[in-house]
């Protein structure tokens, strides 16, 4: 699981905090930057497959094979939280100039028989549930 309180807290946690607080989530730029999001359970599944496979000294890309823009990601997160908040756009920063990311998992499919199983929406539902349970526990 990701660090929810650190300096480099992921955007999804920041957005969940906005949803919890009823504040419009921030998107820097137009939200067109894409990433390949993969749920932690699929990462664990890939690690177990690598441990059990008859391969050594190999590295693998693991992803969901789906390019998702930050705008789309926020739309899914708002949907699974039944939120009507709208994003607030700010000027894009230049911290991360890579505009598109998509994992090529063909090697993992071939050598590990790995295929991701958790959809983006399912992963966002599980992240939301986990995070709100976590902050409830730490608040007590």
Predicted region positions:
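Generic structural signal for alpha-helix termini and adjacent loop/cap motifs
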Residues: 18-22, 50-54, 111, 130-137
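Residues that recognize and position ribonucleotide moieties
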Residues: 36, 66, 101
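Hydrophobic "lid"/C-terminal helical patch
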Residues: 47-51, 74-77, 124-131
């Amino acid at each position: 699981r990701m660090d929810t309180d650190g300096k480099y807290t992921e955007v999804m946690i920041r957005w969940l905090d906005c949803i919890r607080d009823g504040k419009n989530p921030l998107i820097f730029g137009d939200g067109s930057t894409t990433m390949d999001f993969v749920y932690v359970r699929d990462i664990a599944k890939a690690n177990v497959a690598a441990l059990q496979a008859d391969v050594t000294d190999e590295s693998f890309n693991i992803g969901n094979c789906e390019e998702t823009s930050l705008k789309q990601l926020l739309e899914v997160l708002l949907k699974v939280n039944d939120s009507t908040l709208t994003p607030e756009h700010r000027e894009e920063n230049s911290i991360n100039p890579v505009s598109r990311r998509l994992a090529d998992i063909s090697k993992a499919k071939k050598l590990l028989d790995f295929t991701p199983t958790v959809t983006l929406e399912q992963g966002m539902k599980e992240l939301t549930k986990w995070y709100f349970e976590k902050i409830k526990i730490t608040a007590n």
